[in-house]
């Protein structure tokens, strides 16, 4: 429902006059129809073509790309991490993953990467959950799911504000009925400015750790995901490098997470991996019942291939991170 609600057929980009717009639309539809008539491959190829176009659009969009696209190389690392067994990661991928959640899902590419990795390893995946604030990007994600052959009964992408937690599914007050997910992945907007009210201090997501500052909601996103993670689940989130050393309330949240044993691994990545920013980033891996109590630090900041626009991680770089 509403999948094409953001398409503006009256846009001046199609022509100033009604007749001009009509002519151009007819030409576009005719070309698409010709392509479909010659298209005889499987659904995955159609979905991959759509994913490729999103990637090409992201490459040309610069900073705007950060709103909807996670580079494939980053997505591969996150999906590999959350599909490993939480207590015995050396044993390889899980045989099944009941649910996966991305609370800032963009075009849905990260969720689909988790699904693809599980399927490729001969495993099974249950329900896919996502949340996206931008209405256009929300529709992109739903379309991406359908074009990759994910049935509408197998996924639930919701349009809403994660920080406000305005998804009824997640606002269940009965602890016994609180939704929890086997895997949580996210690439939320970096250092996002927000306006937490006084009531946020009593929000169950932040009550035990503290509320992130107005200047940067990074830890608010992290705590949101951790709150809905199962006790034996794995969460992997991309955040700006600053979350590792900024002071004030962020330092207190970070210390509490460490003391509670929730931070499993910190992976430092090279700068300039994203279309939207050149700052260095890190991956934080979180668990609720991790063993042992120490934290693994992986410094991959110097391992990359320099590209024209962005630095690149090769398959070898990615494999070394995951194997470690």
Q: PLM features: residue spans?
A:
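Non-catalytic, mostly N-terminal accessory regions of nucleic-acid modification and defense proteins
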Residues: 1-87, 153-162, 268-271, 292-301, ...
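A generic alpha-to-beta junction signature in SAM-dependent methyltransferases
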Residues: 82, 122, 229-230
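A conserved structural/catalytic subdomain of Rossmann-like adenosyl-cofactor enzymes
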Residues: 162-165, 171, 175-324
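Short alpha-helix immediately C-terminal to the canonical SAM-binding loop
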Residues: 111, 136-140
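Conserved class I S-adenosyl-L-methionine
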Residues: 95-104
């Amino acid at each position: 429902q509403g999948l094409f609600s953001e398409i503006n057929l009256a846009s001046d980009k199609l022509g100033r006059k009604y007749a001009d717009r009509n002519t151009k639309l007819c030409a576009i539809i005719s070309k698409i129809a010709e392509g479909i008539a010659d298209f005889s491959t499987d659904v995955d190829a159609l979905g991959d073509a759509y994913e490729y176009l999103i990637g090409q659009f992201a490459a040309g969009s610069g900073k705007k790309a950060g709103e909807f696209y996670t580079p494939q190389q980053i997505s591969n690392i996150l999906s590999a991490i959350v599909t490993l067994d939480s207590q015995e990661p050396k044993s390889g991928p899980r045989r099944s993953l009941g649910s996966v959640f991305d609370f800032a899902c963009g075009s849905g590419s990260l969720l689909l990467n988790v699904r693809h990795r599980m399927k490729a390893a001969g495993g099974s995946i249950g329900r896919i959950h996502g949340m996206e604030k931008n209405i256009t990007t929300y529709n992109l994600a739903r379309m991406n799911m359908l074009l990759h052959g994910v049935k509408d009964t197998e996924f639930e992408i919701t349009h809403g504000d994660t920080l406000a937690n305005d998804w009824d599914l997640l606002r269940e007050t009965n602890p016994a009925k609180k939704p929890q997910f086997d895997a949580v992945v996210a690439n939320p907007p970096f250092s996002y400015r927000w306006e937490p009210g006084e009531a946020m201090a009593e929000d169950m997501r932040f009550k035990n750790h503290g509320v992130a500052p107005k200047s940067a909601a990074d830890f608010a996103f992290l705590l949101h995901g951790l709150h809905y993670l199962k006790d034996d689940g794995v969460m992997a989130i991309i955040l700006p490098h600053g979350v590792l050393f900024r002071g004030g309330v962020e330092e207190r949240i970070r210390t509490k997470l460490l003391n509670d044993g929730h931070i499993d691994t910190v992976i430092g990545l090279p700068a300039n991996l994203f279309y939207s920013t050149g700052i260095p980033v890190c991956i934080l891996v979180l668990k609720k019942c991790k063993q042992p109590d120490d934290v693994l630090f992986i410094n991959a900041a110097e391992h990359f291939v320099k590209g024209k626009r962005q630095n690149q991680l090769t398959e070898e770089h990615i494999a070394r991170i995951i194997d470690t």
